Regions:
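Adenine-nucleotide phosphate-binding core of ATP-dependent small-molecule kinases
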Residues: 263, 270-274, 281-316
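Short glycine-rich, Thr/Ser-proximal phosphate-binding strand/loop in the N-terminal lobe
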Residues: 14-59
Length: 422
């Protein structure tokens, strides 16, 4: 019998590096590198929740990839026949190429270089991380997992802007969307649990936030666009803004180039810009409760934008059968769920306040009142979805949905519609 695969997932940020090691679908440990003063330190977290701060320090975040093999070997996760079999990285990038998952090769590295120039805020960190893994772990498959792939098959009506279509095609200026891994995780989970309705809206509310309309398990429409800047008011992102207003901001702030404006709209706006104090929703709610005007306004803006986009997506679907709240705010903030749901009665939704306030004991809970359409809180698992998708590439002779069956012989209850057995 073949040994279970060890899969390493990388999640690099601008000021930290996070890694998770899995044995197939089972989490073994995670590593978190961050600055402590001028040195980088590492905290290892085991699957049972226990934590250990490693004694070794590192000069910078670019040195973390080179240290992983040594750390995981010393901690007993690697060694002997145990080695990393695949490395996965999430890609949020514009362009048709990155609406698919790719085994990283020379072509993929070339496309990453192009993507760095197109979206300098989102791509360089993960691209550099991928390049480091290719050099450090020679011969180990590195797979770039698209965060937009779930949205790739939407109708053109939902993908194009109202600009010259030839220009949009030539320069690939389209609404690619994001949070596809999160929404895909939710949809696949609901299918397994047999609670997936025909018309669904998934509210991914976190530091980055988006809504996605799902029709028969497929993305129909979503709030993010060419980049994750479009759509809702977020922690530090403005969300949708008139292009002329954005240019007015550039002039008012005396920015010398477009990247300064893009940085401002992505890093200095949203809840942070509105409140003038914080991008943390817990603090925003505290400020509101203390009577702070700007905190109150920031909270109201966040809720309003979710409600208005939810209404738009309901119209796009022609009705909605269920709503899902997920991600950090969606899963943890009963107050945000309560406020958003207050204006959803016209769609047939009403919260049960007691259920809404209860802790999420299972991966999903229906917090709707009796007689209401379902309102679910579901814990997303993007890493689970990344592994499922990676298996499609690693197991070329397997069913395309990642269920593990041989192509043409799928007889499990995965509820996919890949038609590999038809």
């Amino acid at each position: 019998m073949k040994n279970p695969r060890l899969i390493l997932i990388t999640n690099p940020g601008s000021s930290s590096r996070k890694y998770a090691l899995y044995r197939e679908d089972e989490l073994l440990c995670s590593l978190h590198f961050e600055f402590e003063g001028k040195k980088v330190v590492c905290t290892l977290k085991n699957a049972d929740g226990s934590k250990k701060k490693l004694k070794e320090t590192f000069p910078d975040l670019n040195s973390t990839v080179g240290a992983l093999n040594k750390i995981l070997t010393e901690e007993g996760f690697l060694g002997g026949v145990s080695k990393i079999d695949a490395i996965l990285a999430r890609i949020v990038a514009t362009g048709e190429y990155f609406t698919n998952d790719h085994l990283v090769d020379k072509e993929c590295l070339k496309m990453l270089e192009i993507a760095k120039k197109r979206t300098p805020l989102h791509v360089p960190v993960v691209a550099n991380e991928i390049e480091a893994f290719v050099k450090e772990f020679k011969g180990t498959p590195v797979i770039a997992i698209s965060d937009s792939a779930f949205h790739a098959d939407r109708p053109d009506l939902m993908k194009y802007y109202a600009i010259d279509k030839d220009l949009a095609d030539k320069f690939e200026i389209k609404r690619y969307g994001a949070h596809g891994l999160s929404v895909g995780s939710i949809v696949n989970y609901m299918a397994r649990e047999k609670i997936l309705p025909e018309k669904l809206i998934v509210c991914h509310l976190g530091s980055g936030s988006s809504l996605t309309a799902v029709y028969k398990g497929k993305s129909l429409d979503t709030t993010m666009g060419y980049t994750p800047l479009e759509g809702l008011c977020m922690s530090t992102r403005s969300g949708s803004i008139d292009a002329a207003a954005a240019l007015a901001v550039k002039r008012a702030m005396k920015f010398t180039d477009d990247e300064d404006l893009e940085q401002y709209l992505n890093k200095k706006c949203g809840l942070l810009g509105l409140s003038g104090q914080t991008d943390d929703m817990r603090e925003i709610i505290r400020l509101r409760d203390e009577g702070d005007d700007r905190g109150t306004f920031a909270h109201a803006m966040f809720v309003y934008r979710v409600q208005s986009e939810l209404g738009r997506l309901a119209a796009s679907l022609g009705g909605v059968d269920a709503i899902v709240f997920t991600a950090t705010i969606g899963e943890r903030s009963a107050e945000i769920r309560r406020c958003v749901a207050q204006k959803l009665g016209f769609l047939g939704f009403e919260l049960d306040n007691k259920k809404n306030e209860s802790d999420l004991e299972n991966r999903h809970e229906n917090i709707a009142a009796e007689g209401s359409k379902p309102i679910y809180v579901i814990r997303t698992d993007e890493f689970e979805e990344m592994i499922r998708r990676a298996k499609v590439i690693l197991d070329g002779d397997k069913c395309d949905c990642g269920c593990g069956c041989e192509k043409g012989e799928c007889d499990c209850d995965c509820n996919c519609d890949c038609n590999c057995n038809k």
